[in-house]
């Protein structure tokens, strides 16, 4: 009986250690989740693209304040409502950030000029944290980020499209956006507006 008790005691001790480790890991996860929820308040569908490039949906006032606290220096608005753009511009600039509008409708594919304008902004401000958004942070924002992945980072189209879906791209009602991204490598090769982004021989696969 004593042996059984010692064995039971050993098992109990082992389970206690495992339980303690699991509890510690779980607590760490919970703290991390709380921190993330706090950081993302007012920033729907938020994500980090690179060290200095962020994406998301339409921010609230709290969200813009959070972006400012994160060190973001430029907000790029892809929404097409001129009044909303003007209102956001005042709010963003009151916090000391620069506001840039590249308006277009998610019901249509973007023009080459609009894509180039965004890519040029990012390239011209390598040390500035930039936040780009539309209404949901999914369709127009998804296209801009996919274009960045392909034109600047030379990522495969499939990888860029997968990222679009991860941020809730509306593939059912806006299939033209995916088709545009699938056509982008050809545009980079042949459209003069993308002259600065023509792929180098080493990046052509």
Where are these regions (language model features)?
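Cys-dependent protein tyrosine phosphatase-like superfamily
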Residues: 2-130, 143-205
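Short cysteine clusters
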Residues: 134
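Glycine/aspartate-rich loop-and-adjacent alpha/beta segment that forms the canonical ThDP
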Residues: 140
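Substrate/cofactor-recognition hotspot
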Residues: 137
